[in-house]
């Protein structure tokens, strides 16, 4: 690929380089970088640039291609993708999973795929890189808006996340477009796999027989928005996710300060979250105990000492968004997940 690639390859390479450098600066050099590789344009562009960038840092790349066993020929396709990754310089793995969980084939396949990637990451001792792009972010924001969501949900896909098992999930291409990943593949002469399950008329359907919701948003809602607004809505939707992430972080910081009893820090955080505050009437109507019961129901627990330990006057006087987060944080510190 060379030290100074051009065009779409350059855009992908710079994004991956910045992400991996940031990870190494914070966590140190890992044993390997694990890349989820379906063979589609996004994951293929990620893999080829990650292999190049990681090799310069002396770190192996392990690609994981998951065969869900849901299509005729999927096992052969997974092997072809793994063979390509091996030729590109990765240590290529294929994993066959069983898709039989609740929530339909799409959700079950996603959970099985995540579990497989997590297992490899824990074994290899490195983070997982995923090929989500700005379009994926925009689609997620729209899907969550349709459910009626607040900032915790509308922050959508996190560029970096550490899960409860200690695995770090990185999405270096979240600021790039699908045109960038497709262009990168074309530049380096790679032909991506076309997955028919992603098509609006693909074999996987929603429970009512209609297209899968994400496919409907991708091929229906976003083009319709572009036509109606006379503009590409994807960057604005992605920006909404970033703004909600900043708001959610501020509210969560305030809530944690309340739980820790750091009243002065909480007061200093008030300005950052003032736009989310309830009016006095709203505060009066909702008691801390009622909200604690709601949060307890969400996590499948009883209201106990974890709620009683809160400084009630401080928490009741906070905006609702902060109260909810304070209660969740108290539950977490009380050992409830």
Predicted ranges, named:
Residues 184, 188-242, 269-277, 281, ...:
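Mid-to-C-terminal catalytic subdomains of enzymes
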Residues 5, 130, 206, 210, ...:
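Generic alpha-helical structural element
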Residues 1-219:
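Core alpha/beta nucleotide-donor-binding catalytic domains of modification enzymes
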Residues 57, 227-232, 331-337:
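Short helix-capping/linker segments at secondary-structure and domain boundaries
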Residues 145, 149, 161, 189-192, ...:
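Short, well-ordered alpha-helical segments in soluble proteins
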Residues 126-137, 231-250:
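Electropositive, surface-exposed helix/loop patches at the edges of structured domains
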Residues 3-4, 11-42, 62, 68, ...:
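AMP-forming adenylation/ATP pyrophosphatase catalytic core
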């Amino acid at each position: 690929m060379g030290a100074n690639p051009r065009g779409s390859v350059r855009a992908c390479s710079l994004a991956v380089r910045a992400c991996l450098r940031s990870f190494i600066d914070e966590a140190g050099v890992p044993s390997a970088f694990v890349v989820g590789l379906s063979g589609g344009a996004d994951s293929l562009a990620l893999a080829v640039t990650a292999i190049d960038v990681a090799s310069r840092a002396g770190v192996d790349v392990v690609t994981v291609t998951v065969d869900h066993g849901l299509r005729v020929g999927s096992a052969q396709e997974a092997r072809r993708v793994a063979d390509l990754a091996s030729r590109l310089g990765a240590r290529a793995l294929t994993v066959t999973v069983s898709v039989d969980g609740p929530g339909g084939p799409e959700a079950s396949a996603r959970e099985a795929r995540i579990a497989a990637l997590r297992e490899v990451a824990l074994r290899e001792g490195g983070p997982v890189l995923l090929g989500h792009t700005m379009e994926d972010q925009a689609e997620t924001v729209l899907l969550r808006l349709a459910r009626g969501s607040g900032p915790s949900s509308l922050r959508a896909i996190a560029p970096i996340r550490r899960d409860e098992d200690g695995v770090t999930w990185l999405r270096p291409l979240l600021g790039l477009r699908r045109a960038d990943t497709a262009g990168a593949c074309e530049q380096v002469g790679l032909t991506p796999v076309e997955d028919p399950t992603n098509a609006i008329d693909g074999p996987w359907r929603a429970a009512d027989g209609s297209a899968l919701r994400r496919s409907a948003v991708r091929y229906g809602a976003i083009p319709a928005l572009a036509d109606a607004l006379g503009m590409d809505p994807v960057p604005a939707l992605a920006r909404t996710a970033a703004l909600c992430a900043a708001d959610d972080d501020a509210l969560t910081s305030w809530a944690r300060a309340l739980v820790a009893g750091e009243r002065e820090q909480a007061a200093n955080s008030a300005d950052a979250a003032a736009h989310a505050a309830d009016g006095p009437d709203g505060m009066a109507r909702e008691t801390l105990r009622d909200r604690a019961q709601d949060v307890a129901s969400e996590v499948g627990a009883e209201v106990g000492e974890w709620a009683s330990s809160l400084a009630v006057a401080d928490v009741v006087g906070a905006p609702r968004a902060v109260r909810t987060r304070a209660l969740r944080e108290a539950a977490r510190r009380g050992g409830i997940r």
